[in-house]
């Protein structure tokens, strides 16, 4: 019975189009679909159905917003900015400060500095205490040569999260590097 099941599964996988499929477990090391999204083709996300992870075309509603956000965040942090923007755009709640923040991050890193800054400001208008958005906004200001504005964001992070926070340290480092 198991042999028939495996043969059926193998036949299905060979005829299921160009999307990649991954068995859960095994050598996955317990990684999440968000981490595994980079195994997919650009324009796809990883969807877990039962014990199988499958790459599917990214579109609104294909996954819960939190899962799309995590996959978009992973893509953005790994330098896949345009792909990340596709995933983030599929999120239904476009007013989530996290979504706005990583949309800003991806745009800034892709060379659209002013657009990135606009998204950080939108995120902060919703949640002024979102220190990661403040860090990224400050880094955007550094990239624009506006150290004065970056210093203001550094002060805001200090007031909200302290000088020991990663966001404070990272922005302080970016400001120091630009000032030398």
Residue spans of the language-model regions?
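Long, contiguous interaction/recruitment modules in multidomain scaffold/adaptor proteins
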Residues: 20-70
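Alpha-helical segment of the N-proximal tetratricopeptide repeat
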Residues: 61-94, 98, 107
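Canonical tetratricopeptide repeat
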Residues: 102, 136, 170-174
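TPR alpha-solenoid repeat register
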Residues: 99, 133, 167-168
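Residue-level recognition of tetratricopeptide repeat
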Residues: 96, 130, 164-165
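Conserved structural position within tetratricopeptide repeats
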Residues: 89-93, 124-125, 159-162
């Amino acid at each position: 019975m198991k042999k028939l099941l495996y043969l059926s599964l193998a036949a299905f996988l060979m005829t299921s189009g160009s999307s990649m499929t991954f068995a859960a477990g095994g050598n996955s090391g317990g990684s999440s679909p968000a981490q595994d999204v980079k195994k997919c083709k650009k324009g796809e996300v990883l969807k877990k159905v039962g014990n199988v992870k499958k790459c599917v075309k990214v579109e609104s509603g294909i996954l819960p917003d939190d899962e799309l956000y995590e996959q978009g965040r992973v893509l953005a942090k790994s330098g896949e900015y345009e792909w990340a923007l596709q995933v983030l755009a599929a999120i239904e709640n476009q007013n989530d400060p996290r979504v706005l923040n990583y949309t800003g991050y991806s745009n800034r890193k892709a060379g659209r500095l002013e657009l990135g800054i606009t998204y950080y400001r939108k995120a902060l208008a919703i949640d002024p205490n979102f220190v990661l958005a403040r860090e990224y906004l400050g880094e955007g200001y550094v990239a624009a040569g506006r150290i004065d504005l970056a210093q203001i964001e550094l002060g805001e992070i200090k007031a909200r999260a302290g000088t020991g926070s990663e966001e404070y340290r990272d922005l302080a480092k970016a400001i120091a590097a630009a000032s030398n």
